[in-house]
């Protein structure tokens, strides 16, 4: 289920080659849901919506296809080495030697890894503010039928509601995902 990022959109005038290459590779498809009454345009959404196929994780997996991605290890230390970096787990075992390291993790976790190596941007990481977001998943055989596939109410506690079945390549059973508004 797409319980995080619901779709990608591209600003008007964006080069189409990236979108087209993802669609040609079968990792993305256009999605144009029927929006519910009173729905505003979702924040930062353009007119060209794209979803991952068969799930949203297909796009980052495609982007990382030529990278050495390793899972199920908790890296707790970065150590400068002769030719790059050593990545150590919580037992001190070197899990990877790398020329470069890209961190795509929450700021507090990044700060814990970067502070021992003298990273100069710790103040910037400390200034990051998070806002929790509640997500509700509803799946069942007898769910009511709605006249819309997605809605982004402009007021109230809900910021986004979508029928997962409206997305190409998804299970046809109605499965609803509701995300709270930022203010809720």
For the regions a protein language model found, what residue spans apply to each?
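Short beta-strand to alpha-helix junction loop
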Residues: 10-11, 32-62
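N-terminal FAD cofactor-binding segment of flavoenzymes
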Residues: 1-35
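Glycine-rich phosphate-binding loop signature in dinucleotide/nucleotide-binding domains
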Residues: 81, 91-97
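A structural motif corresponding to the C-terminal end of an alpha-helix
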Residues: 63-70
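Central helical "cap/lid" subdomain
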Residues: 95-151
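Generic structural signal for small/hydrophobic residues in well-ordered secondary structure
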Residues: 8, 63, 102-104, 138, ...
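A conserved short coil-to-beta-strand element within the FAD-binding core of flavoproteins
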Residues: 71-86
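Active-site substrate-recognition segment that forms the wall
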Residues: 131, 137-184
């Amino acid at each position: 289920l797409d319980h995080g990022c619901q779709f990608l959109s591209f600003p008007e005038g964006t080069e189409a080659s990236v979108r087209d290459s993802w669609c040609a590779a079968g990792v993305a498809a256009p999605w144009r849901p029927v929006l519910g009454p009173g729905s505003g345009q979702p924040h930062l959404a353009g007119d060209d919506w794209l979803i991952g196929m068969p799930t949203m994780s297909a796009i980052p997996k495609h982007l990382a296809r030529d990278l050495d991605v390793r899972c199920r290890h908790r890296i707790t230390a970065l150590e400068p080495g002769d030719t790059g970096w050593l990545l150590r787990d919580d037992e001190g075992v070197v899990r990877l030697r790398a020329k470069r390291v890209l961190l795509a993790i929450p700021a507090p976790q990044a700060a814990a890894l970067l502070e021992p190596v003298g990273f100069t941007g710790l103040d910037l990481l400390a200034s990051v503010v998070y806002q929790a977001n509640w997500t509700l998943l509803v799946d069942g055989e007898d769910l009511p039928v709605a006249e819309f596939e997605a809605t982004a109410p402009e007021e109230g506690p809900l910021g986004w509601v979508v029928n997962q079945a409206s997305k190409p390549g998804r299970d046809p059973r109605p499965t609803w995902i509701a995300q709270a508004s930022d203010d809720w």
